[in-house]
Amino acid sequence: MRQPLPFVIVVAALSWASLGTAALSQDMVLGAGSTFAYPVLAKWAETYEAGTGVKIDYQAVGSGVGIRQIKSRTVDFGASDGPLRPGELAVAGLMQFPIVFGGVAPVVNLEGIGPGQLRLTGSVLADIYLGRITKWNAEAISELNPGLPLPNQAIIPIHRADASGTTFVLADYLARVSAKWRDEIGVNTAVEFPTGIGGKGNEGVAGFTSRTKGAIGYVEHAYAIRSKLASVSLQNRDGEFVTPSRQAFQSAVANANWAAAPAFYALLAHQSGKQTWPITGATFALIYKQQQRRLTAIEMLKFFDWSYRAGAKLADELQYVPMPKDVVQMIESAWAEVTDARGQPAWMEPTTAKH
C-alpha cells in the first residue's frame, strides 16, 4: 500500500496575511476562497486526513481572494461560487469544475418570526437591498404575509463587505427577477450595495444578522442552520413559496445542463421546478492545467475524486448536494488536460488511484 506523503494540510479560516508564507512550502496542498463551501470542505479534509494521512490547507477567505490567489500561483487551487468565463480561464491557463452545490438563504432577525414563516418574492428582496423598502410592515411585504405580525421596524440589510461568491449567486438571482437590480447593481462577486452593513465572510453576515434586531442577511444554508437564523420562504420561478433545503437545492441541480456548459460555466439561480430553491449555486475549484509540482497535483486530484465519492455522504449530511455521477464523469474526463511541467498526465483513473 502506498505510504502517504507527509503533507501538511490544515483546514481553517485563516487570515489572508498567512497565505503568502504558507504557500512557500513544497510539502503542502493549499487552497483558498469560498466561505460558502467551507463547512463541507473542512469536514472532507478532516475525514480524508484520518483515512489517508494526507492533509489539505483550505483558507476560507472569500471567492474573490481565492481567484486572485490562484491567478498569482500562491495556492494550488482556488474555490469560487462565481464561475469564471471560458475566455478568462484560457488567458490564465486555468480550468474549473464544480465540487459541490448549495443554496443561499435570506435570513431575518424578527421577534416572533421563525424559519419559513416570512414570505418574500425576488422583486421584494431586491427592493429591500436597493433601499426602496425600508420598513418590515411595508405594504409590499404585508401583502405577502397576511396574518403575520410584522413590526413597524426599520429593515437593516446585512451584506458582504468582501468579494464573495455568495454575493455573486444572490446578485445573479436578483438580476434575473428584478430589472432595477440588473440595471442599477448588476452581477459580480463585489457589488455596490446602496444601503446596509457589510460583514466579512458568511460568518460575518450571520453574526451581524444574529446581533441586529430587524436585520436581513444572506448566507449559505449551513450557516443559517448553525447560527439558528430564520430563513425566509421565497417564491420560485413556478410561483411556489419554498424554504431552503437539500431537496430544494437538488431540484435546481437536476435542471442544469452541464453537458452544454463550456468550461463548466453554468449558473443555477431561478431554475424551474415546483420544489426548486431559487438561489442555488455551485462552488467551483480553479486549478492550473499545467502543474508545477507533480506530486501535489496528484494528491489534489485524488482528494477531489474522494470528495465526489466517499465525501458525498458528508456533503448530504451538511445540507449540500453532492455531484451527480454523470457530472463526475465529465469532470474527471476533463482532468486528462492536467499535466505536470514535463507534459505528463497528473490524473490516474479511480481504479488505479487507491485511497
Regions of interest found by a model, annotated:
Residues 6-20:
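Bacterial N-terminal signal peptides
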Residues 24-355:
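Flexible loop/hinge segments at secondary-structure junctions
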